[in-house]
């Protein structure tokens, strides 16, 4: 019987784009694991809620046990929205997080140069368009074409739910090129987002293949 595995957890420790795929939260604790994990969840939820339209691709959290400092790296396609005029928005965000955690927080903003090749951002874009009542097939095909034109080796997009307002939910998939999900040498980027439409939730999954790792990259 076939089993499903999360694409990111499956590739932990594998090199991607010259860097090792690592946990999105990087810290260690013998006793306060549950408390620190809950703190991470609060940080992520606050950032995603406050910067919902800023194209957040990834949030990395690092904690130093000795100093009690929290370092938050925000990867975004729209750094101007996150930083704000004269850094006002990022300063306000830092103060919010310091209030939330009662710790000193450092916020770093990193730009995603090619959002059309980032699976999470593509999934978010499709979900936003579906919430705006766009035709799902046209939206999926447009995103697929954009990814392939930008240099992807392969891409696959799947939408599941009451597509087109039908009574029974179903799934529809479009793909182009090669997307080998069982090959660890393949640099597969995965993204997921739920679109809250009037007909219910529609799940959007995106896989983008950036190519096979060479021996030099390993």
Swiss-Prot record:
Keyword annotations: Ribonucleoprotein, Ribosomal protein, RNA-binding, rRNA-binding
| SMART domains tied to this protein | KH (SM00322)
User: Its GO biological process terms?
Assistant: translation
Please state what the protein is called. Answer: Small ribosomal subunit protein uS3
- Designated gene of the protein: rpsC
Q: Which InterPro entries does the record match to this protein?
A: KH_dom (IPR004087), KH_dom-like_a/b (IPR015946), KH_dom_type_2 (IPR004044), KH_sf_prok-type (IPR009019), Ribosomal_S3_C_sf (IPR036419), Ribosomal_uS3_bac-typ (IPR005704), Ribosomal_uS3_C (IPR001351), Ribosomal_uS3_CS (IPR018280)
UniProt KW Transferase keyword: no
UniProt lists the family membership as follows:
Belongs to the universal ribosomal protein uS3 family.
Task: Give an example GO cellular component term for this record.
Answer: cytosolic small ribosomal subunit
Domain of life where this protein originates = Bacteria
Q: Which classification does the entry list for the species?
A: Bacteria, Bacillati, Actinomycetota, Rubrobacteria, Rubrobacterales
């Amino acid at each position: 019987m076939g089993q499903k595995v999360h694409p990111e957890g499956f590739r932990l420790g594998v090199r991607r784009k010259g860097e090792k795929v690592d946990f999105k939260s990087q810290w260690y604790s013998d006793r306060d694991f549950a408390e620190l994990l809950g703190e991470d969840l609060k940080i992520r939820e606050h950032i995603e809620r406050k910067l919902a339209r800023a194209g957040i691709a990834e949030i990395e959290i690092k904690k130093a046990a000795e100093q009690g400092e929290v370092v938050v790296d925000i990867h975004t396609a729209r750094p101007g929205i996150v930083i704000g005029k004269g850094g006002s928005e990022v300063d306000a965000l830092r103060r919010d997080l310091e209030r939330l955690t009662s710790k000193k927080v450092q916020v770093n903003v990193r730009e995603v140069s090619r959002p059309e090749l980032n699976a999470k951002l593509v999934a978010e874009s499709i979900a936003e368009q579906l919430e705006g009542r766009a035709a799902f097939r046209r939206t999926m095909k447009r995103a697929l074409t954009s990814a392939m034109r930008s240099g992807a080796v392969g891409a696959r997009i799947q939408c599941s739910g009451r597509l087109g307002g039908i009574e029974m939910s179903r799934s529809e998939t479009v793909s182009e090129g090669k997307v080998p999900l069982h090959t660890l040498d393949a640099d597969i980027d995965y993204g997921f987002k739920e679109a809250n439409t009037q007909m219910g939730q529609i799940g959007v999954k995106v896989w983008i293949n950036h190519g096979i790792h060479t021996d030099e990259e390993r």
